[in-house]
């Protein structure tokens, strides 16, 4: 076996690297090239900020493509740019907009990985004769007895991206490789300088790639102008406290920007797209104990539909550490259900819930799903 757990010698093993134009994927290409693999770089043209926000000169995607091409030239590997804009708009951007309109808080990176990178790009890589598709994600995969592979949290806890990759299927894991899963970020940047890459000190992206300056409301208003309608801001006790310009400007758990002179700290508890109401209340009203999941991807050893109280750890936001919980299959609702050991605040439909075997820093990823419904207590979810 070679360093990628593949049977052929590196020089006989073709690896397609998904090159975003950032330091991480560029270093992956450099590492594999140095190890003697037949490396091919592919960059996806996914979006145009100008088209999304209706502003001229708003596109930064062109710079990323330029950076990826320059990295490939420095490393001496072939590089191709593929136009995936139409499929990205349909699978990710349109779904993102529709989710917000329905009062949800979507995580578009999960859908991009699921539909674009690990489905469409993976198929393209195989068409090019690739033995593996490598990415710059900070997550680890390791072989298991029997020949299958499992997904694990990355070595660098500050960079771990397993939350966004829970939807990776077992079949995809057989072909995917994540060389940075065992490296700290500072080592990645050191390698970039060693390889002579111009992106060695390029800042990490902080925003959703197709949302400039983090203003997702502008993107949604542009894509779905008829869906933005004003409504009332209502307290849980029934009082009308004010008005708003559209529920797309709010997320569950939000406190800032409510502009309510009530003298008490209030948080967004629920969004009602049917009535265009933003429901607010005290922080304790945000506590969630039970989460029902949709579109569940399961990587565990036991069949998901046979689980009835499996101890796990779950992550409901990328910035939070996994917390203890119990996983079961709700036969009446025909969905997976997570019961949190300790209630969590700010859990919203549309968010991702990643499931781990335990709370450890290198825990195995067991899958996850999209949060369909939340309940304040176990009794309410029964």
Swiss-Prot record:
One of its GO terms (cellular component) is cytoplasm. The keyword Disulfide bond applies. One of its GO terms (biological process) is tRNA wobble position uridine thiolation. The keyword Disulfide bond applies. One of its GO terms (molecular function) is tRNA binding. The record marks 137, 351 as: Interaction with tRNA. Residues 159-161 are annotated as: Interaction with tRNA. It is an enzyme of class 2 (transferase). It is found in: Cytoplasm. Pfam families: tRNA_Me_trans, tRNA_Me_trans_C, tRNA_Me_trans_M. ATP binds at residues 18-25, 44, 136. Disulfide bonds join 112-209. The active site is at residues 112, 209. Its EC number is 2.8.1.13. HAMAP family: tRNA_thiouridyl_MnmA. Belongs to the MnmA/TRMU family. This is tRNA-specific 2-thiouridylase MnmA. It comes from Methylobacterium nodulans (strain LMG 21967 / CNCM I-2342 / ORS 2060). The gene is mnmA.
